[in-house]
Every structure is written in C-alpha cells, then in structure tokens.
Design a protein with these regions (language model features):
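Glutamate identity and glutamate-enriched acidic tracts
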Residues: 4, 11, 33, 43-44, ...
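Phenylalanine-focused residue identity feature
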Residues: 14, 38, 42, 55, ...
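Mg2+/Mn2+-dependent nuclease catalytic core
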Residues: 17-40, 44
Length: 146
C-alpha cells in the first residue's frame, strides 16, 4: 500500500497454509518471500524513512502452531528444529525448552500490544521494532514491523 501524498509505504502479507490430501500441512510461501520484505523495510529504515515505512503480517489464529503457516524451522520434515535467525524476527514467540522444535513455539501474549525491539543475529538492530497485536481469544493476529 502506498500513500503518495505522505510518502507512506506499507507492505502487507496474509499468512495461510493448506492441507494436502495426505493430511499434512504446508506453508503457502517460502521464507525467502518474507525475508525480502524484511530486507526492504530495514533498507528503508537505514535510509531515514522509519516513520514512513512498515511491514504488516496478519494471520488467523486457527492452527496450533505458527510454524504451520510460517517456515520457522531449519531443514525439512514434520518436526524441524527452530531456525534461530528466523525466530529472531518474532520476539512475541517463546520456547518451551532449549531444544525447541518449530512446532513447539508458543505465543508470548504477555508482550502483546507492547513495542518490542528486534535482536537479529549479525545485524545492526538500531530502530527495528515490532508490535504483536493479539491474544489467545482473538480470531486474527497481526505483527507490525516498523
């Protein structure tokens, strides 16, 4: 979305998955599709447009794990271990133990509606923030990156 008169640019993505005939779930897009959007936002922030750029992700809260709709694991298979570089983009997720599998990630609702700074591995994280909008009873969740 682009509001030319204000020079606002907002990238919006809707997360969804699909269930195959065999009963397994698959995410709708590869991680690289989202990585491109994060990279675009961070380049815009670095060029001084923090207050004019955002990346919004929305999804229905209808699956037992966000990993059913977003590739947060490393490797293939039905229970991949968490990819630390990817999970760093989601400060509103928590691990249940140190050897966490992507399917075991849970929402950390205590930080919902609060600004969270991103702590990305190997990157300058200055000015990279996120707000998670949702609670366990909500039908739809949002993550706004700015």
């Amino acid at each position: 979305m682009y509001i030319e008169s204000k020079d606002y640019k907002i990238e919006i993505k809707f997360l969804k998955n699909w269930k195959s005939d065999s009963g397994t779930y698959s995410v709708s897009k590869s991680w690289m599709e989202y990585q491109k959007d994060f990279d675009w936002l961070f380049e815009e922030i670095a060029s001084g447009k923090k207050s004019k750029r955002a990346f919004v992700i929305g999804w229905f809260n209808c699956v037992d794990s966000i990993s059913k709709i977003m590739q947060l694991g490393k490797g293939r298979g039905c229970r991949p271990k968490v990819n630390e570089e990817r999970v760093a983009y989601f400060p509103f997720l928590k691990r249940v133990d140190s050897q966490t599998y992507a399917a075991d990630l849970e929402y950390y609702y205590d930080v919902a509606y609060q600004k969270q700074s991103l702590n990305l591995i190997g990157r300058d994280n200055t000015g990279r923030d996120c707000i998670f909008l949702g609670n366990s009873d909500d039908v739809f969740h949002f993550a706004i990156y700015y």
